[in-house]
């Protein structure tokens, strides 16, 4: 893997989402203009199996809020993407000036690590070759759901893609686990630790407690 510091973008992955298991919890996050408090999404086999938040006193209202603004009335959604946004300067500015709800989604998603539920970012474009800025082809454009378009396109897409960004101060670690069991940390205690990524931490270290 490589995290190019010259880019205010993100490093992303969409493969093997059937193996996604666990709970996604964020104490507070804006999804567009909608604020979610204590958002929790449970995943089994790469799909949402339970969900909750604490915006309202009523559990039914909280469920409806998620169904209206994340699930978009699907019974469940798959994991569409995991990416690590590297624009820590934008993250700091959003926190300092309390403008997280004003950021366009293509900026907000690049401020930190995020999961997306729904379709991948290559929806309806999987068959077109896509390249990184360094000229290398992006080959992981499909997954077990989007590939269904070759037989029945109605089973391949959900027509939604919602990015949920995790604040750095809520991160323990993001770690690569290889097939042989060896590991490499990318983020540890809310800071980038891959050699060469130290400049990404400067805006984070400059934030007021």
Language-model segments: residues:
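Single conserved hydrophobic/aromatic residue that forms the stacking wall/gate
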Residues: 1-9, 13-14
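Long, well-ordered mid-to-C-terminal structural blocks that present hydrophobic/aromatic surfaces
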Residues: 17-73
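Active-site lining segments that contact anionic ligands and/or coordinate catalytic metals
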Residues: 19-21, 36-38, 45, 77-81, ...
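Residues that cap or initiate secondary-structure elements
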Residues: 30-32, 47, 88, 121, ...
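Charged, compositionally biased interaction regions
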Residues: 92-209
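Dual-mode signal for accessory low-complexity, basic/Gly-rich regions
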Residues: 50-122, 126
């Amino acid at each position: 893997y490589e995290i190019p510091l010259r880019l205010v973008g993100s490093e992303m992955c969409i493969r093997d989402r059937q193996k996604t298991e666990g709970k996604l919890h964020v104490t507070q996050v804006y999804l567009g203009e909608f604020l979610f408090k204590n958002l929790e999404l449970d995943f089994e086999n790469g799909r949402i199996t339970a969900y909750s938040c604490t915006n309202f006193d009523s559990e039914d209202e909280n469920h409806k809020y998620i169904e209206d603004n994340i699930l978009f009335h699907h019974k469940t959604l798959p994991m569409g993407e995991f990416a690590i946004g590297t624009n820590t300067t934008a993250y700091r500015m959003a926190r300092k000036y309390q403008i997280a709800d004003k950021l366009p989604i293509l900026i907000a998603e690049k401020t930190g690590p995020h999961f997306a539920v729904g379709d991948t970012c290559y929806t309806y474009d999987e068959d077109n070759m896509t390249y990184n800025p360094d000229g290398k082809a992006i080959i992981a454009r499909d997954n077990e759901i989007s590939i269904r378009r070759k037989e029945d396109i109605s089973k391949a897409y959900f027509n939604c893609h919602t990015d949920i960004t995790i604040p750095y101060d809520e991160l323990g670690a993001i770690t690569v686990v290889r097939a042989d069991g060896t590991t490499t940390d990318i983020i540890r205690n809310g800071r980038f630790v891959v050699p060469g990524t130290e400049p990404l931490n400067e805006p984070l270290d400059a934030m007021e407690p």
